[in-house]
Amino acid sequence: MRRRRWTRSSRLALLLGSIALLLTGCSAHDAEKKLRFGWPTGVTKQAEEMRVLWTWTGVTALIVGVFTWGLIFWACIAYRKKGDELPKQTKYNLPLEIFYSIVPFLIITGLFYRTIVVEDDVNKLSKHPDVSIQVDAFKWNWQFEYHSYTDASGTVLQPVYPGQKHVADAAETKGQIGCDEASSNDSYSCGAPGQQGAANGPLYLSTNGSSDEIPVLVLPVHESVRILEHSEDVIHSFWVPEFLFKRDVIPYGTTSTGRDNQFEFTATSTGSFVGHCAELCGTYHSQMNFEVRVVTAEQFQAYLNALAKYPPGDKNYPARQSLALKAAGMSPYATTTHPFNTDRTARSASQNQGS
């Protein structure tokens, strides 16, 4: 009997030692990577919240699975046939039935609650985001209009190019450039797309993509950004894969104020990321790309100031976006994607160049 106990203890110690040895060989980074369970790496605060929900859902499923399979194997071994004697036939076990009815319900309730909490956080709109940007989608490109930027000191920056009066002076805005704050639904009404003026939007702080130049959406890291979406023709969809989030851009003008989807996020990593239209919208849908460039607050402020120096439509500054990016110390052109070829007969760029 003593030898038997010693054998069981030795086996248990060997098992625990093996587990400890395996754990010591895993770094914190490796453990975090394994706990992702295939979840992609995001670059926003909201993406990390979704990752945590996914991780704990997977851990919960593993615990339930291990417990369930453990009971199955235990029953198979402990109650295996040991002779010709017919085992005692049992039925009804009230405590057990209550257990496996209540516990799954509690698990589902907990997961449902956490899902609702994370979903609300992802869709939450703050009263005063650090940056407010209007995104206009059209076949087959994008236009970005910077409506406001509040720096770390709480100052609302309103750069203008020489000879133009502050848009905010004419619009009498409440911390927003060219936008009126609507207290009824905690959103912003910025006028119809394409009709930028003193009261509709900051024309001098907009960038417009074309078949020759990819539009670059420059954003500050670790600051809240609100995106207000407009579509001038059909349904599009704003999607940046690294954000792990997309939202449809509905055609403007379905009501008196238009239907403007909006959302907020906070980027946590600097870098350049390609954005796409994720809703089939016509011939060049697959090439309707843009670039998101997350930079430091200093670079972002420098970019806005530089962009304001070059009036849109000025023949002396045809590539104002490139000039502003270069002035802020960044690559003047997109690095994650390239402009599309409007020649529908060309099969590839190389063939088109060689013809």
Per-region residue spans from a language model:
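Alpha-helical transmembrane segments
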Residues: G65-Y79
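General helical secondary-structure elements
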Residues: M1-T7, C76, N316
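Hydrophobic alpha-helical segments
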Residues: R2-I63
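Alpha-helical transmembrane segments of integral membrane proteins
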Residues: G58-T68, Y100, P104
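Non-transmembrane, membrane-proximal soluble domains of secreted or membrane proteins
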Residues: S27-W54, C76-S355
